[in-house]
């Protein structure tokens, strides 16, 4: 018997009915996991099964033999389709039932069918199921046990109906349940790719095999079930609305946004409705992301949040919302979802504060950028240049993807190659004229340092040292006292902090005293005075205070490893590449090193391998370093390497790796090469005429680098279902396949369009010596539509006036293509295809043009297409009769 839930319709009822159905069948309810996953290989929780992945892979104990959940998910890979199609979302909920070595295929299928037909009340005649092409067992269960019409059981290929955790490991076939919105079309030639007719709402994964390195499938002793039912999709079906956005899960947010904009969703054109859908969808996503601990930034999941927030603001402005409104949308989203996710209300203040802060920051950016972009668009360019896009980005902080989005709305593209070129030119200018600190502040620091004695450096002997504050700068002005929250620059009488110099970055750490903590972010040198840059985290600091200066030992160790590795790299280059190589510059950071050197040619891949092997050999040999001070002439006589053009004192510090390297150096180093651990070259490239650059990592940074690479390799391996060593060949093969498929598809579309068009010729209207044909032809791309129009014009003769319009994707009203082909006699009459079709396109919210005899244009309002074609026909009838 089904649970006592009478035909659920509302989203909350659907969720409750699903969970109750499976709980009554022995499944343990599992709360939704965070959108920030435990799995480090993914930024966000993208699927309902992700929290259970370690269980399926045998890495974690199962929570119960059977489980059920409603998991919140975020996907942004198709963000440009959000609002434009009926079913694309960023935030969505996946209802799932899972079996960990308990029940299997027949039980999962029977329950899925029972839930769909008896609990949700779907008519079996409106359902279609898919199975993997080789899964005879699943087909037999659907046909013989459940009783599905065999014509409504569709076999699909591996790409659609076979799940794998990677190139090796657990895997198995899938079976999906689709809802048919047009059952009257019958059971013949069912095409599940027809999104206007079918929607897949339930996916059943049968994990029954283990695949080895050779690709052999072995049946698993313990088989698993992983299913997913899209809550938004089931709501669309049960509520009888045309798309997921008009369900009660999202539509209240659309109404909120419409109210803020003073518009009526039902009365808007496609563009306006799309903006409201984007706002509704993204408002759910950003609210949930912030609730789970994501903050806006320019990296990782923080960048995803920032991009979503900015898209909401951008689409609000398109609707005429000029004032801040994200807080209002956040309030509405919390109210809509808090019953299912009570933590939203618990973290309300945090969520709203982040929304308000990020919107204020972006509105300032947006207003400046939109004004400049409007000027660019007013000139009606064919393309937004890379220089223009870069000016928007560099001067106004306008994101490139936003420029691309606005350009697309106007039927334009952005010169991305030009943008990258402008970006690189800016990097070079920044290097030449870099000023790392405000001039006013710099002046105050220089003045402070000029009046002080040299700072005694104690960092060679110890990482902790008692010191006295001898000078202080706050807000660019000399000061006697600073308080919590102040950003300060200060000088100590003596310090264990290494000040930036010789290519090595300054130390990090803290100053500590009674009820005092000062975080030190960097240290640099003015003459021989070490200036510490930091923030007072707690307490008050005054000139004359005694503090304990503590260097962060982890940062120091990592800098030391990279500095000694830099010395080894120079020695190895002299040995492997050319003994005359000399240093041109360097950077020694906590997580990487960069070494520039004079060399007339690139270092070959074989030489790079030799360099790595040689350096790692020296590391393994555990050479103890010897550091001593000696007269400059004695050091040079001993063979110590000095940097050309550098001025040295009479007495210098010499860092010696016996038998390997000897250099003049004031930086910090490991005591023994074994402390470096490992060395890895990341890149080699030219940076100027006769100067090459090697970037590398050492110590723990090598593991971090390799882990990043490993994640990428694993993702590619899983995506392509091949062994890591086969990825390159697989990519090359796919590129060739894509090239061939693209060419074949273009040819097929062109042929199809011409074939469809041939039948249209009979519909041409004779007007004197002219033949007029205006028709709609959907499902054909721009090239195909041009071929069709040209073919018809050729067929109808010199007096032909052919206008064709259509939607390349009939389910997407956001893209319209229009083509005009005029014969010689029509052109001679003063009609130009380019001008004419451009005017027609404006009726569809677009533009375009071309030659007098053949032209193409585009639009964004598919709902206006029929009316535009009618006006085109009427206009040409009048012109040709004249």
Swiss-Prot record:
PANTHER family: ALANINE--TRNA LIGASE, CYTOPLASMIC, ALANYL-TRNA SYNTHETASE. It is found in: Cytoplasm. The keyword Ligase applies. Binds 1 zinc ion per subunit. Its cofactor is Zn(2+). Its EC number is 6.1.1.7. This is Alanine--tRNA ligase. The keyword Ligase applies. InterPro entries: aa-tRNA-synth_II/BPL/LPL, Ala-tRNA-lgiase_IIc, Ala-tRNA-ligase_IIc_anticod-bd, Ala-tRNA-synth_IIc_core, Ala-tRNA-synth_IIc_N, Ala-tRNA_ligase, Ala_tRNA_ligase_euk/bac, DHHA1_dom. It comes from the Bacteria. Catalyzes the attachment of alanine to tRNA(Ala) in a two-step reaction: alanine is first activated by ATP to form Ala-AMP and then transferred to the acceptor end of tRNA(Ala). Also edits incorrectly charged Ser-tRNA(Ala) and Gly-tRNA(Ala) via its editing domain. One of its GO terms (cellular component) is cytosol. Consists of three domains; the N-terminal catalytic domain, the editing domain and the C-terminal C-Ala domain. The editing domain removes incorrectly charged amino acids, while the C-Ala domain, along with tRNA(Ala), serves as a bridge to cooperatively bring together the editing and aminoacylation centers thus stimulating deacylation of misacylated tRNAs. GO terms for molecular function: alanine-tRNA ligase activity; aminoacyl-tRNA deacylase activity; ATP binding; tRNA binding; zinc ion binding. Keywords: Aminoacyl-tRNA synthetase, ATP-binding, Cytoplasm, Ligase, Metal-binding, Nucleotide-binding, Protein biosynthesis, RNA-binding, tRNA-binding, Zinc. It catalyses: tRNA(Ala) + L-alanine + ATP = L-alanyl-tRNA(Ala) + AMP + diphosphate. Belongs to the class-II aminoacyl-tRNA synthetase family. GO terms for biological process: alanyl-tRNA aminoacylation. Zn(2+) binds at residues 563, 567, 665, 669. The lineage of its organism: Bacteria, Bacillati, Cyanobacteriota, Cyanophyceae, Synechococcales.
């Amino acid at each position: 018997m089904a649970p006592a839930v009478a035909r659920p319709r509302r989203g909350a009822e659907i969720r409750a009915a699903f969970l109750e159905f499976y709980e009554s069948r022995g499944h343990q309810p599992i709360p939704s996991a965070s959108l920030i996953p435990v799995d480090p290989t993914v930024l966000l929780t993208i699927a309902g099964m992700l929290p259970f992945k370690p269980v399926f892979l045998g890495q974690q104990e199962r929570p119960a033999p059977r489980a059920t959940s409603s998991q919140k998910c975020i996907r942004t890979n198709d963000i440009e389709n959000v609002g434009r199609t009926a079913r694309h979302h960023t935030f969505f909920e996946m209802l799932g039932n899972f079996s960990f070595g308990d029940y299997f295929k027949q039980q999962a299928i029977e329950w899925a069918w029972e839930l769909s037909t008896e609990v949700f009340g779907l008519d079996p005649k409106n359902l279609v199921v898919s199975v993997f092409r080789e899964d005879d067992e699943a087909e037999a269960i659907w046909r013989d046990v459940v009783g599905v019409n065999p014509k409504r059981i569709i076999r699909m290929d591996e790409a659609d109906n076979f799940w794998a955790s990677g190139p090796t490991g657990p895997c198995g076939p899938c079976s999906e349940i689709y809802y048919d919105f047009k059952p009257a079309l019958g059971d013949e030639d069912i095409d599940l790719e027809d999104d206007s007719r079918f929607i897949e709402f339930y996916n059943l994964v049968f994990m029954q095999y283990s695949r080895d390195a050779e690709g052999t499938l072995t049946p698993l002793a313990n088989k698993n079930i992983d299913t997913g039912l899209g809550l938004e999709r089931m709501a669309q079906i049960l509520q009888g609305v045309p798309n997921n956005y008009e369900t009660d899960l999202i539509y209240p947010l659309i109404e909120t946004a419409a109210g803020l904009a003073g518009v009526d969703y039902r009365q808007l054109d496609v563009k306006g409705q799309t903006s409201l859908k984007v706002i509704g969808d993204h408002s759910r996503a950003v609210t949930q992301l912030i609730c789970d601990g994501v903050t806006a930034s320019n990296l990782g999941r923080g960048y995803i949040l920032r991009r979503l927030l900015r898209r909401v603001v951008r689409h609000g402005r398109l609707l005429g919302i000029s004032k801040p409104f994200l807080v209002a949308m956040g309030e509405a989203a919390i109210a809509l979802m808090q019953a299912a996710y009570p933590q939203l209300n618990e973290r309300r203040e945090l969520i709203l504060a982040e929304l308000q802060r990020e919107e204020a920051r972006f509105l300032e950016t947006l207003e400046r950028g939109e004004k400049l972009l409007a000027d660019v668009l007013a000139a009606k360019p064919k393309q937004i240049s890379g220089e223009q896009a870069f000016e928007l980005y560099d001067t106004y902080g306008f994101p490139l993807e936003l420029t691309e989005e606005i350009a697309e709305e106007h039927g334009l593209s952005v010169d991305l190659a030009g943008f990258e070129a402008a970006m690189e030119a800016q990097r070079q200018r920044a290097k030449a004229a870099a000023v790392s600190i405000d001039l006013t502040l710099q002046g105050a620091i220089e003045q402070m340092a000029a009046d002080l004695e040299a700072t005694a450096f104690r960092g060679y002997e110890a990482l902790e040292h008692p010191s006295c504050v001898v000078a202080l700068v706050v807000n660019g002005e000399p000061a006697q006292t600073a308080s919590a929250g102040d950003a300060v620059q200060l000088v100590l009488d003596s310090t264990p902090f290494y000040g930036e110099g010789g290519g090595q970055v300054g130390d990090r750490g803290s100053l500590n005293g009674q009820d005092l903590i000062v975080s030190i972010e960097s240290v640099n040198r003015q003459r021989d005075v070490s200036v510490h840059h930091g923030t007072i985290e707690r307490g008050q600091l005054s000139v004359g205070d005694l503090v304990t200066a503590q260097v962060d030992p982890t940062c120091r160790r990592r800098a030391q490893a990279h500095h000694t590795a830099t010395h080894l790299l120079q020695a190895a280059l002299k040995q492997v590449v050319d003994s005359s190589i000399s240093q041109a510059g360097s950077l020694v950071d906590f997580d990487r090193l960069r070494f520039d050197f004079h060399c007339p040619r690139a270092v070959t891949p074989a030489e790079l391998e030799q360099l790595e092997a040689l350096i790692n050999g020296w590391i393994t040999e555990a050479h103890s370093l010897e550091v001593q001070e000696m007269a400059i002439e004695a050091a040079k006589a001993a063979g110590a390497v000095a940097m050309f053009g550098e001025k040295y004192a009479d007495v210098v510090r010499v860092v010696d790796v016996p038998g390997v390297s000897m250099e003049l150096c004031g930086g910090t180093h490991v005591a023994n090469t074994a402390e470096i651990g490992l060395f890895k070259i990341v890149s080699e490239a030219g940076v100027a005429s006769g100067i090459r650059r090697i970037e590398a990592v050492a110590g723990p940074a090598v593991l971090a680098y390799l882990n990043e690479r490993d994640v990428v390799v694993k993702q590619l391996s899983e995506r392509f279902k091949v062994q890591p060593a086969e990825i390159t060949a697989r990519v090359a093969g796919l590129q060739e396949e894509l090239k061939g498929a693209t060419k074949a598809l273009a040819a097929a579309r062109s042929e199809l369009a011409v074939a469809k068009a041939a039948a249209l010729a009979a519909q041409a209207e004779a007007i004197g010596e002219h033949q007029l044909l205006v028709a709609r032809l959907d499902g054909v791309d721009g090239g195909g539509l041009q071929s069709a129009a040209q073919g018809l014009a050729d067929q109808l003769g010199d007096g032909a006036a052919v206008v064709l319009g259509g939607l390349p994707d009939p389910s997407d009203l956001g893209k319209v293509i229009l083509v005009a082909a005029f014969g010689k006699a029509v052109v001679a009459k003063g009609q130009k295809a380019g001008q004419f079709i451009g005017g027609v396109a404006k009726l569809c919210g677009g533009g375009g043009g071309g030659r007098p005899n053949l032209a193409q244009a585009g639009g964004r309002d598919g709902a206006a297409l029929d009316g535009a074609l009618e006006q085109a026909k009427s206009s040409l009838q009048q012109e040709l009769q004249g």
